[in-house]
Amino acid sequence: MCKNMRDPRHDILFEPINIGPVTSKNRFYQVPHCSGMGWRRPNTLAAMRGVKAEGGWGVVNTEYCSIHPTSDNDAFPYCALWDNEDIISHRKMTDEVHKHGALAGVELWIGGSLIVNLGTRLPPLGLRNHPQQDTSVYHPGQTRCMDKNDIKNIRKWHRDAAKRALEAGFDIVYVYATHGYLLSEFLNPETNIRSDEYGGPLENRVRFIKELIEDTREIVDGKAAVATRFSVGLNDSESYDAFALLADLPDLWDLTVPDYSVEMGNSRFIKEAALKDSVLKARQLTSKPVVSVGRLTSPDTMVQLLRENVQDL
């Protein structure tokens, strides 16, 4: 019996690729996604991520991972890297992932006005004194408008979380700048009404993201890659202008689109590779590798995306 039944047309999918200082063994990249487990069920979560690595994924990521108690999304199951106890929980996952030769990534998350902090009872930090914005959460909440000291604190909390991520064994550390959370608020001129160096012109509105990418790169110091998750949309030209200002800062771009129903829509209604055109336009602006999603199930489609230089993973 033939030992290798793989169609040689698909060999490119199994080629290794460098992501900054680390190398994925292939082009199969599990982007951050929720699991229903989070910090409450670390053993089950580690086993699930480990099964993915055993199945052949080159990179396996966590779900959104809070950097500080001011970003608490109870009762939704999120991950956390608040203190050293969380390092132990995450080490369970990274050990399982590494056991099968895959890289482990963590998506550091700052909530903003989409959260209520039902668990910690701390005021959520946002760009306005404003009721919380997540219409799926039927609890009253109020965001406290951030001042410069809050920005300074968040940068410190993010650096501290990146340090813990290294201690937990992660190979890729994210700056999470999409899906409506705090960094998205900075980008959006409708929510960012600041009059200081973090508001106004686009160069100012991307400043905080730029600082967090640079902070994270300094902390990981070549021991892990820095990824940035970011949205671009063909109907939003400024999203590409913002992307261009940051284009070569991280080691990897994890690109999506602003419309959740397209990014995560049912395959009955959303065609395979639905994000292709949006991602390609951004891909042409950066020299760094790009990963994206899009209900990809056909290896032929995956190969086409790589051959056409739409994305790298």
Model-predicted regions and their roles:
Residues M1-L313:
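Flavin-dependent oxidoreductase catalytic cores
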